[in-house]
C-alpha cells in the first residue's frame, strides 16, 4: 500500500569541504570590481555579518554551521530509515550539468537503472569514493506516463547526457550518509530547471565579473512556482495510488547570495526566505502557489523552486510539517531549510 514521506534538506556544496574553505563563495564575490568600496572589508558590513566572519574569516562559525546542518541531516536520515521507502524521489536543480545547450527541459525524470557518481576531491571524509546506487526505472516510467496523462509533458531520460549525476542529487545522497553507514535506497532524480534565465547564460553558477550579461543573452525563464506547485501535487497524487512507499525529498538551499544582486552578491535575502518558511510552516499554500518568478529572481531564490514541488505535494496530501528548521547565515551563501513530514 502506498505511503509517502515528505522531506526537505540542503545540498550546500561547501559542506563536503573543510571549515576553513566554507566561506569561499563570499571571498570570490569580494573580488567583484563593481563592489562598493564600503563593502570591500568587514568594517562596512552589517554587524551580524561581521560577527559571523570574526577574526578567523568565518572558520569558527563554519564549525557551528556544519554542526547545525549535520544535526538536521541526521534527523532526516533517521526519519528516512524509520519509514523504509521503496525509493526516494529527489527534486533538485540542474546547474549546467545535464541541462546544457543541446537541451534544456523545464523538468526531467531520470529513469535510470543504476546511478553512479564519485565524491569531490579534498572532501571532509578524506578519501575519494565511488557510489553505485539502484534507480527505479519502473516507478520513474509510470510517474512520467501518468504526469503526461494529467497534462504535464514530463521529459525523461534513461541515461545522463553529460554529467553522471547533478550535485543536487549526489550531495543529497552523500549528506544523508554523512557518517558513511551506507545508503542503499533506490533513487529517482527529478531535475528542475530552477536557474531558468541563467542556466546557460551564467552556466547555473556564480556571476561573471569580466563582462555584463545583457538581457538579450539571458535564457527563457524557469517554470513558475505555480506550475511546479501543481507538478508536485500531481506527483503526490500519482504516487499515492501506486503500490510503493515513497520518500519525496526537496534538495536545495533557498536564497543564494551569489544570485542576489540587490545585496551585491554578498549575503542572501533572509527576510524573503523567512516569509516563505513561515508560509510552509503554516501550510499557507496560496502564498507558495501564487509566488511570482520575478520575486524568486529578485531574492536569489531560484532553488526554492524545488521546494515549490514539495509544497504542492504536501498540499495534495493535506500534510503538515512535523519538524522544521531554518539555518540562517550572512557569510555562507544561502539559507538552509529542513523539513520532515511523515504520514499521519
Q: Where are the regions a protein language model picked out?
A:
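Beta-strand elements within well-structured catalytic alpha/beta cores of enzymes
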Residues: 86-93, 190, 244-254
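Flexible, D/E/H-enriched segments
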Residues: 1-83, 105-230, 241, 260-344
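Active-site microenvironments of hydrolase-like enzyme catalytic domains
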Residues: 88, 92-111, 255-256
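Nuclease catalytic cores that cleave nucleic-acid phosphodiester bonds
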Residues: 224, 237-248
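Extracytoplasmic, non-cytosolic globular domains
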Residues: 227-235, 247, 254-258
